[in-house]
C-alpha cells in the first residue's frame, strides 16, 4: 500500500483552527511529538489518525487527498514550463503559500490587479466549491416549501411577510431574468422562465436580502472591490441552487439513479446544465457525492464556467484540447456523449457531455449554444449509469491534455502549435 503524507494539509488545518501543536494533539488523542512528525512528513498519515481528524474537525477524508496539490502543480507547470513535474508537485504539497505566490506573480509583475473573474473563480476553487453554512441555510429555507407545485407562491409569501417585497411575475420579455428594487420593494421576473428558474431567481434575491451578512463574511477577505462584488453575487447564486436542489434530496436522487442527470433534472424541474453544476458542489463533510469536474464551453473552446473537486487541471492559456469530448457534444444535440480519457499525468477520467441551448429567440437571430461536461476519476465511474458498457481501462482511453500550449504530447496529431 502506498504511504500517504499529509503534513502540509494538517499544518493548514491547525493554522486555520488557531491551535498549537499541543492543543491539536490533545484533541486527537496523540502525542505532540507524533503530530510534529506528521506535520513534517516524517511519518505517513495512518487510517486511525485520518478518522480522528475527520471526526474531530468535521472534515471529509478527501480534504487530505492529493487532488488539490496535483491541480496546483498543473497550474505551476504553465508558469514554469521547464521545471520538473516532481519538483512542482513537491512545492504544491509542502509549500502551498509559495505555490500561491508563484501563481500570483504574473498579475503582480504586470502592476495591475488580477482579473476579478479569475479571482472569484479561484476563491470558489479554494473552498472546494462548497460553503457549508450557505448550503445548510438554503436547505433549511427550502424544507418548509415542500412540493414544487407550491414553492413559488410560498417563497413569494415569505418575501412579502418577512421583508415587504412584492413578487411580480412575467414582467418583461428581455434582459436579466429578474430585478429587485429596494425602493419599490418589489422583485420582477422575466417572462418565459420555468418553475425551477423562477424558484432560483426568488431564492437568489432572498439570499441577498436575508443573508447579506453571511455573504459579506465569505466575500470580505477578497481585496479587489469588483471581485468581492462578483463573489457576493456568486455566493447568492450558490444559495439559490442549493434551495432549488436541496443537498439531502439531490444527493439521495443522485445515488438512487446512479447520477442519471436527465432523471435527476426531471425530479427537480431543472435543466441539464444546472443539475450538472449542482452535482459538482456536493462535498458536504460526511455526505459527499462523487468528486466531479464541471465545465461549460462554446464552439470556439472558450470556457465560461469551470469548477473542480478533483485533480483535473484546466489550462489558463490557449484553447482546450480538441480531442476532449466536450467538443463532440455540438455534433449530437440533445444526446449525451461519453468518453474515457487519460491525461498526461496518467490520470484516467470518464466524461459525459451534452449541448445545451439558451432561451428561444426570434426567427433569424442566433440562439445561444454551449456544451457542458461532467467528469470524474475513472475510479468512481462504476457509480454512474453512464459507465455501463464502457471500457474504463487506461489502455483504451483517449489521450487528451490541458491545451496545446502547455500539453507535453508532442506527437499528438491534433496539435495546433508547439508547446511553450
What residues fall within each predicted segment?
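Short, conserved structural micro-motifs that define repeat-unit consensus positions
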Residues: 7-10, 20-21
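Residues within helix-turn-helix
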Residues: 22, 33
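Short juxta-domain linker segments that transition from a proline/glycine-rich
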Residues: 2-5, 12-15, 26, 30, ...
Amino acid at each position: 500500500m502506498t504511504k500517504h503524507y499529509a503534513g502540509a494539509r494538517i499544518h493548514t488545518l491547525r493554522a486555520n483552527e488557531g491551535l498549537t501543536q499541543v492543543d491539536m494533539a490533545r484533541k486527537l488523542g496523540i502525542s505532540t511529538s507524533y503530530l510534529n512528525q506528521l506535520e513534517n512528513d516524517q511519518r505517513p498519515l495512518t487510517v486511525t489518525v485520518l478518522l480522528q481528524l475527520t471526526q474531530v474537525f468535521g472534515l471529509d477524508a478527501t480534504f487530505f487527498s492529493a487532488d488539490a496539490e496535483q491541480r496546483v502543480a498543473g497550474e505551476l507547470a504553465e508558469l514554469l514550463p521547464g521545471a520538473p513535474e516532481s519538483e512542482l508537485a513537491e512545492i504544491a504539497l509542502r509549500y502551498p503559500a509559495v505555490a500561491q505566490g508563484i501563481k500570483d506573480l504574473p498579475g503582480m509583475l504586470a502592476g495591475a490587479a488580477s482579473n476579478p473573474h479569475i479571482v472569484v473563480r479561484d476563491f470558489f476553487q479554494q473552498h472546494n466549491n462548497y460553503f457549508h453554512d450557505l448550503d445548510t441555510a438554503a436547505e433549511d429555507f427550502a424544507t418548509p416549501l415542500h412540493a414544487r407545485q407550491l414553492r413559488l407562491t410560498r417563497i413569494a409569501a415569505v418575501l412579502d411577510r418577512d421583508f415587504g417585497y412584492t413578487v411580480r411575475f412575467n414582467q418583461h420579455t428581455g434582459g436579466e431574468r429578474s430585478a429587485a428594487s429596494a425602493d419599490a420593494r418589489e422583485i420582477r421576473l422575466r417572462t418565459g422562465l420555468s418553475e425551477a428558474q423562477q424558484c432560483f431567481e426568488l431564492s437568489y434575491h432572498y439570499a441577498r436580502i436575508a443573508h447579506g451578512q453571511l455573504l459579506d463574511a465569505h466575500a470580505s477577505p477578497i481585496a479587489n472591490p469588483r471581485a468581492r462584488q462578483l463573489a457576493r453575487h456568486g455566493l447568492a447564486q450558490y444559495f439559490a441552487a442549493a434551495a432549488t436542489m436541496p443537498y439531502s434530496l439531490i444527493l439521495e436522487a443522485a445515488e438512487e439513479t446512479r447520477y442519471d442527470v436527465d432523471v435527476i433534472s426531471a425530479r427537480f424541474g431543472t435543466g441539464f446544465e444546472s443539475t450538472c453544476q449542482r452535482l459538482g458542489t456536493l462535498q458536504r463533510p460526511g455526505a459527499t457525492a462523487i468528486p466531479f469536474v464541471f465545465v461549460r464551453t462554446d464552439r470556439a473552446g472558450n470556457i465560461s464556467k469551470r469548477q473542480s473537486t478533483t485533480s483535473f487541471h484546466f489550462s489558463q492559456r490557449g484553447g482546450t484540447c480538441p480531442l476532449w469530448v466536450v467538443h463532440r457534444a455540438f455534433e449530437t444535440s440533445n444526446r449525451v456523449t461519453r468518453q474515457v480519457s487519460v491525461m498526461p499525468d496518467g490520470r484516467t477520467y470518464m466524461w459525459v457531455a451534452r449541448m445545451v441551448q439558451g432561451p428561444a429567440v426570434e426567427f433569424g437571430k442566433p440562439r445561444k449554444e454551449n456544451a457542458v461536461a461532467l467528469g470524474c476519476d475513472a475510479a468512481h465511474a462504476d457509480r454512474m449509469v453512464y459507465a455501463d458498457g464502457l471500457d474504463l481501462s487506461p489502455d483504451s482511453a483517449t489521450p487528451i491534455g490541458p491545451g496545446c500550449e502547455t500539453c507535453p504530447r508532442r506527437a499528438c496529431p491534433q496539435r495546433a502549435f508547439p508547446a511553450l
